Amino acid sequence: VMDVVYNHVMSADDFCINKLVPGYFSRINEDGSYSNGSGCGNDTASERNMVRKYIVDSVCYWADEYHMDGFRFDLVGLLDTDTINEIVEEVHKTHPDVIFYGEGWTMETGVTKDNVTLATQRNSASTPDFAFFNDNMRDGLKGSVFDTATFGFVSGATNAEKKMADSFMANESWCKEPSQIINYASCHDNNTLFDRIAGSKTTSSEEDIIKMNNLAAAFYMTAEGVPFLQAGEEMLRTKVNDDGTFNSNSYNAGDEVNSIKW
């Protein structure tokens, strides 16, 4: 499965298509600034016809020439549903088993046309063959990724049973189809599962933390939906800095932090 990032480019001013047709590829605010729902300086105007064609052709090329089994879309909530549906339709014409999923978070972005529906969790009914990460299960199992002092179901959170029962049965407010729900406890973003539990349960023994890790795995692997696990999570992967602290955003850390300790 290939991780693809179509929701923004590194530098909108320097991007080749914006050089050829200034402002066409990116969403522009009324004051002339770039829309920045991505937090990366710009948002792709996927709702424009030729931007959509560019993205669809790109994904089809990866599927045709490199035989990808699936695509994971970064911040797909910034792309429109028509583009996503066209991608799925075109790829499935020749590769019907390719899977599609992504981050369907809701973000503010300056779309350039009226009546544009974005590919967010809550619009999942508009993209029936596309799945979304389930942050309800992620945070419900181990605590919020935005507050590492909080507990989750496996670490002893109170009054968590109803929420987790709903997640287990795919009874999510944003989606009723299990095939569109990616259940997980951790991914490359934020802390690993082991580090997140250990960070909030500092008085627990390592043996108990391992049991919590195993309980989380049992939960998302048997729940209604599609299970997803970070590589190494099954062997208690940890990301530790030189000073002994846990690294929660290791994109710029070296192999010592990011490598899987086989």
What are these language model-derived features?
Residues 75-175, 233-262:
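Active-site-proximal helices and loops of the catalytic beta/alpha 8
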Residues 6, 77, 104, 155-159, ...:
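Short, flexible loop/turn elements at secondary-structure junctions
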Residues 3, 62, 73, 100, ...:
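Conserved, mostly hydrophobic/aromatic
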Residues 1, 68-72, 97-101, 183, ...:
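Structural preference for beta-strand elements that scaffold enzyme active sites
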